[in-house]
From Swiss-Prot:
UniProt subunit comment: The complex is composed of six subunits: RnfA, RnfB, RnfC, RnfD, RnfE and RnfG.
Residues the record lists as FMN phosphoryl threonine modifications: 176
Family: Belongs to the RnfG family.
Protein known as: Ion-translocating oxidoreductase complex subunit G
Cross-referenced SMART domains: FMN_bind (SM00900)
Record-linked Pfam families: FMN_bind
UniProt subcellular location: Cell inner membrane
Domain of life: Bacteria
EC number of the protein: 7.-.-.-
Enzyme class: translocase
Family annotation (InterPro entries): FMN-bd, Ion_transpt_RnfG/RsxG
Molecular function via GO: electron transfer activity; FMN binding
Species: Shewanella amazonensis (strain ATCC BAA-1098 / SB2B)
Function, in words: Part of a membrane-bound complex that couples electron transfer with translocation of ions across the membrane.
Length: 215
């Protein structure tokens, strides 16, 4: 009886090791492919929120890291993509976090010119409720397009709220928390951009590590 138990235990252990090794091999085999798909998706989004006709540089390669937990909703350094034309700054795209979504963090990216005009906003990742909060995805709703061409200023940032809170933006039926959190993140981030964009364009490029991130 004891030998049978030991034998079965060894078989189970061996099976578990084989399964673990198989999962590790699959993860390793697909890691580069997933990273490449993510890079291509980011490139596609950058083309949407910072139009090619306003810049002539490689936007994806013109990246710096910045850090401000209060403005960006996270302690991690976040990428900023700097757009220029004839070596003159024209616009940027910045990733940011809305930490107070209904189901946690919402990661988004904002394209904005140097005068504060929003060129586009897109949702990168989220866990909001399907059919309600997921209207922050462009494929589910045109809501994110309501940011297009709006000019942000510190004096008028009280308008960057949902209508229920006295602002200019629609909320979602049955889901006010998600758009409210989204708008707070956009507003905080644009204030941060306005205060720092001139300095960012004078920074050395590099997003491979946190060495160039703001402290």
């Amino acid at each position: 009886m004891q030998k049978s138990i030991i034998k079965n235990g060894l078989l189970l252990s061996g099976f578990a090791l084989i399964c673990t090794a198989a999962v590790a091999l699959v993860n390793e085999a697909t890691k580069d492919k997933i990273a490449e798909q993510q890079r291509l998706e980011l490139t596609r989004i950058l083309h949407q929120i910072v139009p090619d006709e306003i810049h002539d540089n490689d936007l994806g390669g013109s990246c710096i890291l910045v850090h401000n937990a209060d403005a960006l909703g996270t302690d991690e350094p976040m990428p900023v993509y700097l757009a220029s034309s004839a070596n003159e700054p024209v616009a940027l795209a910045i990733e940011t976090i809305a930490p107070d979504g209904y189901n946690g963090n919402i990661r988004l990216i904002i394209g904005v010119d140097l005068k504060g005009k929003v060129l586009g906003v897109r949702t990168l990742t989220h866990q909001e409720t399907p059919g309600l909060g997921d209207k922050i995805e462009l494929r589910k709703s045109n809501w994110v397009l309501s940011f297009n061409d709006k000019v942000f200023s510190d004096k008028a940032n009280d308008r960057w709220k949902v209508k229920k809170d006295g602002g200019d933006f629609d909320q979602f039926t049955g889901a006010t928390i998600t758009p409210r959190a989204y708008l707070k993140a956009v507003s905080r981030t644009l204030i941060f951009v306005s205060a720092n964009q001139a300095e960012w364009f004078n920074r050395p490029l590099g997003c491979d590590n946190g060495a160039n991130a703001d402290e």
